[in-house]
């Protein structure tokens, strides 16, 4: 008889976390927690005239758009077939308004840790999903189970989060890390 066990794997970069719950067939395996540290975060801002250094800010005001990039290394024994649930867990430190946000697959090799970009690092323009951004500060979870289950033969995963220019001052800040270029 197959017995279910849960392996909670988290990847964290300061206040950002990627949590994967995996299932396996072994009955002698206890529940285990393993931390995987996120290796990089970066910031994109739409205008060169904006010289502000942002802390993973997601903003949709027309002409002043920003997006956050997060990169995670997967463990050597990662197997997408065993994923039961996967969540991107973010710590919202400030927010002006809630709105529709978008999650994209980013090119892990296209951005460096701590950089501020005015030319957006490469990402897949078809969003993985849209979701309503938080309206309050604190922990916020995005279910990325379907995406994580679909990845094959990858050593890392990266995300871009943004809001489309909607003249909506979302001004959503994630975490408290300062990314200086």
Predicted regions and their residues:
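Short, charged, surface-exposed loops that flank catalytic or proteolytic processing sites
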Residues: 79-85, 152-155
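Beta-strand-rich interaction/scaffold domains
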Residues: 92-157
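Sec-dependent signal peptide recognition
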Residues: 2-10
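Flexible, small-residue-rich N-terminal segments that precede or flank a structured functional core
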Residues: 25-77, 94, 105-109, 163-168, ...
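C-terminal segment of classical bacterial N-terminal signal peptides
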Residues: 5, 15-23
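Ser/Thr/Pro-rich, low-complexity mucin-like regions
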Residues: 148-176
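A short beta-strand element within beta-rich, extracytoplasmic domains
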Residues: 72, 81-95
């Amino acid at each position: 008889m197959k017995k279910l066990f849960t392996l909670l794997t988290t990847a964290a970069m300061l206040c950002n976390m990627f949590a994967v719950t995996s299932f396996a067939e072994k009955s002698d395996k206890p529940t285990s927690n393993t931390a995987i540290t996120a290796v990089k975060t970066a910031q994109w801002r739409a205008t060169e005239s904006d010289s502000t250094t942002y802390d993973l800010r997601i903003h949709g005001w027309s002409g002043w758009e920003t997006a956050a990039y997060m990169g995670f290394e997967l463990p050597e024994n990662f197997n997408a077939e065993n994923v039961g649930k996967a969540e991107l867990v973010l710590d919202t430190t400030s927010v002006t308004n809630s709105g529709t946000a978008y999650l994209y697959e980013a090119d892990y090799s296209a951005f460096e840790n701590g950089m501020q970009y005015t030319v957006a690092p490469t990402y897949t323009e078809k969003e993985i999903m849209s979701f309503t951004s938080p309206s309050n500060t604190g922990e916020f979870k995005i279910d990325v189970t379907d995406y994580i289950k679909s990845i094959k033969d990858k050593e890392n995963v990266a995300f871009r989060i943004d809001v489309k220019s909607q003249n909506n001052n979302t001004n959503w800040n994630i975490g408290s890390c300062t990314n200086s270029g």
